[in-house]
Swiss-Prot record:
It comes from the Eukaryota. This is Glyceraldehyde-3-phosphate dehydrogenase. One of its GO terms (cellular component) is cytosol. It catalyses: D-glyceraldehyde 3-phosphate + phosphate + NAD(+) = (2R)-3-phospho-glyceroyl phosphate + NADH + H(+). Its EC number is 1.2.1.12. NAD(+) binds at residues 13-14, 35, 80, 317. It is an enzyme of class 1 (oxidoreductase). The keyword NAD applies. Its main location: cytoplasm. The active site is at residue 152. It is found in: Cytoplasm. InterPro entries: GlycerAld/Erythrose_P_DH, GlycerAld_3-P_DH_AS, GlycerAld_3-P_DH_cat, GlycerAld_3-P_DH_NAD(P)-bd, Glyceraldehyde-3-P_DH_1, NAD(P)-bd_dom_sf. Belongs to the glyceraldehyde-3-phosphate dehydrogenase family.
């Protein structure tokens, strides 16, 4: 089967890391990029050097129409209006919408006017169907043209919640994600009228914040709808975050049982390569560049009793999430081709 041809709209953090993951996996073929705010020489520089993930392992050059990466030409467009991007001329059928701006079905659908066939939003969406690989990707149908890969935190929490719910019954749960700072935060205290705390210096503070990631699990696992909610603590680290899920189970269970069950789920079936498992004494930087959605930390969790437990699972919120964007495109293109 032909490798799906991909276009990326928005060459920010996720756009560039999706690009790197596309090359690392070989499962999709990026043929075009659109970003009105980045000219090609600067795009080449930003792709080549990365403060978190290091230098790009390959060759990057520019030519009159875009970039040449590992000897392959990639068209570069600079359109502000998604409807004006000539994706079809570059052969791009699957578009990664990673600007963070066009996150509704209506807005993201504009890409279809330029010759694209499907749009994958690399963020939660108010109305587009959300898919989490290993959890509900089999619900995808070929008539869906705009879909969301949910958020990095939902991709970490959902596989964990699925294993607990499938095996022990999840009555209810509260999640806290201890989350690295992101591009929306500030380097020094600055105006942030909609989120006063969010305007404070990212590298100096632990900042409580809201997140819809836990509630979104109810959209990808309908039986958990209304059973999970959560919050975020933004902390002064550049990358890698960790989910803390405190939950009640229907069945009586020991923490050892939970460890065995999660370990088994990580080694075979739908969650292999998506859910990880470790008993090592790791810290956050040990997981930079880890491609799992969720890495269960067996030593970090605790149980109060047979029904009340705290589970801890790590995720590289840039790399792991971006790999799932690539996986989702590879998966839906396979379904589309059948």
């Amino acid at each position: 089967m032909a490798t799906p041809k991909v276009g990326i709209n928005g060459f920010g953090r996720i756009g560039r890391i999706v690009f790197r993951n596309a090359i690392a996996s070989g499962d999709v073929d990026v043929v075009a990029v659109n970003d009105p705010f980045i000219e090609t020489h600067y795009a080449a520089y930003m792709l080549k050097y990365d403060s978190t993930h290091g230098r790009f392992q390959g060759t990057i050059e520019t030519y009159d129409e875009g970039l040449i990466v590992n000897g392959k030409k990639i068209r570069f467009f600079a359109e502000r209006d998604p409807a004006a991007i000539p994706w079809g001329s570059a052969g791009a059928a699957y578009i990664v919408e990673s600007t963070g701006v066009f996150t509704t079905t209506e807005k993201a659908s504009a890409h279809l006017k330029g010759g694209a066939k499907k749009v994958i939003i690399s963020a939660p969406s108010a109305d587009a169907p959300m898919f989490v690989m290993g959890v509900n990707n089999k619900e995808y149908k070929t008539d869906i043209n705009v879909l969301s890969n949910a958020s990095c935190t939902t991709n970490c929490l959902a596989p964990l919640a699925k294993v607990i719910n499938d095996n022990f019954g999840l009555v209810e749960g509260l999640m806290t994600t201890v989350h690295s700072y992101t591009a929306t935060q500030k380097t020094v205290d600055a105006p942030s009228a909609k989120d006063w705390r969010g305007g404070r210096t990212a590298a100096q503070n632990i900042i409580p914040s809201s997140t819809g990631a836990a509630k979104a699990v109810g959209k990808v696992i309908p039986s958990l709808n209304g059973k999970l909610t959560g919050m975020s603590m933004r902390v002064p680290t550049a990358n890698v975050s960790v989910v803390d899920l405190t939950c009640r189970t229907e069945k009586a269970v020991t923490y050892e049982d939970i460890k065995k069950t999660i370990k088994a789920a990580s080694e075979e079936g739908e969650l292999k390569g998506i859910l990880g498992y470790t008993e090592d004494d790791i810290v956050s930087t040990d997981l930079i560049g880890d491609a799992h959605s969720s890495i269960f930390d067996a030593k970090a969790g605790i149980a109060l009793n047979e029904h009340f437990i705290k589970l801890v699972s790590w995720y590289d919120n840039e790399w792991g999430y971006s790999r799932r964007v690539v996986d989702l495109i590879a998966y839906i293109s396979k379904v589309d081709g059948q």
